[in-house]
Amino acid sequence: MEEIKKYLKLEISQQRNFIYPLIFQEYIYAFAYDRGFSRSILILSENLGYDNKSSLLLVKHLITRIYQHNYFIIAPDDSNPNPFWVCSKNFFYEIILEGFAFIVEIPFSLKLISCLEEKNKKIVKYQNLRSVHSIFPFLEDNFSHLNCLFDILIPHFVHTEILVQTFRYCITDVSFLHLLRFFLYKYCKWNSLMTPKKASYSFSKSNQRLLLLLFNIHVYEYESFFVFLHNHSSHLRSIHFEVLLERIHFYGKMECLINIFIKLKDFHANLWLVNESCIHYIRYQRKLIMASKGTSFFMNKWKFYFITFWQCYFSLWFYTRRIYINQSSNHSFEFFGYLSSLRMNPSVVRSQIIENSFLINNIIKKVDTLVSIIPLISSLAKAKFCNVLGHPTSKPIWADLSDYNIIDRFGCICRNLFHYHSGSSKKKFLYRIKYILRLSCARTLARKHKTTVRTFFKIFGSELLEEFLMPEEYVFFFTLSKASCSLQGVYISRIWYLDIISINNLTNYK
């Protein structure tokens, strides 16, 4: 118990006042629109030679640098404002809120950097681990040997006061906490965001950065407690545990864990070691997946531990009857826009001993990743690229743009989707998405020029084809076209990229 109290009691040096960046006032508007600021703080802090990566001098230098590239400055005290630049009250609140979200992210980015530095790891290596695709090779290597898994949806409704109290453990700045509470209650309709049926909230979906960050911090607190209790309750330590902290998604892996029985009344745990080789824990946003090669009885005990611990200490309530434990060979789960499952590949081996020969049937388990085509088409339908049945439609809102911008926008969306879903074992679903986007582009251009799609394809068909070709396809079609080899590998090969640090909005349909 004393060790737990020491863990919960933070050192004074770790408690910082995070309200000071707000004194820059007009600079809030500047850095609110810099999407790469969290990445630049890592790079510039090393290049400029600062020891304290959260120093006031560094923050001011970075904000000034961003501000110099901001040519459109809105002056609220202007006596003769231009009607074109007059913005609503909520618009300024959105800007301040996004800047406020950036300030909240600072301590957690520093926490990750310090964690990597303690282990003598270079930040350069960390850049590859930030990729969304980095988790899928891990699934391919480990999930094929596991038997049981369960995936649950974490309840999204959390009272705003609970989120504020989460910060009280690490921040002593009272004004910061009051300002955070003010934003959550006054301008962020958290209940509307957390309840799917209520779609009316003050800010746009792209400006939910602070709300999603606070929710992930709340869940991360639970996960850190979980690892701490495990490591201090047995002599069996985790072989590997890493936390890759991003804005909206976290990833963790724990091996050689222990079996835990819970007494529901006082929540004291009886712990002892079991002969369980490993458990894998993965979470992205609200999706939580646990997998093991143990029995369903073992997984049931883990399930009740998670639920009880979450309800008692974090006020998140689960419906236990809706959480099922499935056999990995008969269950598929959606994760990061992919539909993952275990595929059984039978193979026959002929063995011969002297004069006798016989056949041996082997079954090899392999993780198969497919594109979730139905939700992806639903996302395209919501974005007005097609109807609910997948029939392409024009995009009237883009009809006023130039031909180049229209083709470039459609081509960019298509390339991004192909790039992200390059790990799919079946590419034919992606070519259906390409067909929808290409025909939607043609209908948008035909609508603009007041002509038919057939006539437009006769004139610009080849240019549209080149715009929608992927870099991988260029390689196969132009490099391998001279060789007498089959192009079947184009449709079945899987490629995982290490430069994807965010999910396309069309893929992140949930």
UniProtKB/Swiss-Prot annotation:
<protein>
    <recommendedName>
        <fullName>Maturase K</fullName>
    </recommendedName>
</protein>
<keyword id="KW-0150">Chloroplast</keyword>
<dbReference type="GO" id="GO:0008380">
    <property type="term" value="P:RNA splicing"/>
</dbReference>
<dbReference type="GO" id="GO:0006397">
    <property type="term" value="P:mRNA processing"/>
</dbReference>
<comment type="function">
    <text>Usually encoded in the trnK tRNA gene intron. Probably assists in splicing its own and other chloroplast group II introns.</text>
</comment>
<comment type="similarity">
    <text>Belongs to the intron maturase 2 family. MatK subfamily.</text>
</comment>
<dbReference type="Pfam" id="PF01824">
    <property type="entry name" value="MatK_N"/>
</dbReference>
<dbReference type="GO" id="GO:0009507">
    <property type="term" value="C:chloroplast"/>
</dbReference>
<dbReference type="InterPro" id="IPR024942">
    <property type="entry name" value="Maturase_MatK_N"/>
</dbReference>
<keyword id="KW-0694">RNA-binding</keyword>
<keyword id="KW-0819">tRNA processing</keyword>
<keyword id="KW-0934">Plastid</keyword>
<dbReference type="GO" id="GO:0008033">
    <property type="term" value="P:tRNA processing"/>
</dbReference>
<keyword id="KW-0507">mRNA processing</keyword>
<dbReference type="Pfam" id="PF01348">
    <property type="entry name" value="Intron_maturas2"/>
</dbReference>
<dbReference type="GO" id="GO:0003723">
    <property type="term" value="F:RNA binding"/>
</dbReference>
<dbReference type="InterPro" id="IPR002866">
    <property type="entry name" value="Maturase_MatK"/>
</dbReference>
<dbReference type="InterPro" id="IPR024937">
    <property type="entry name" value="Domain_X"/>
</dbReference>
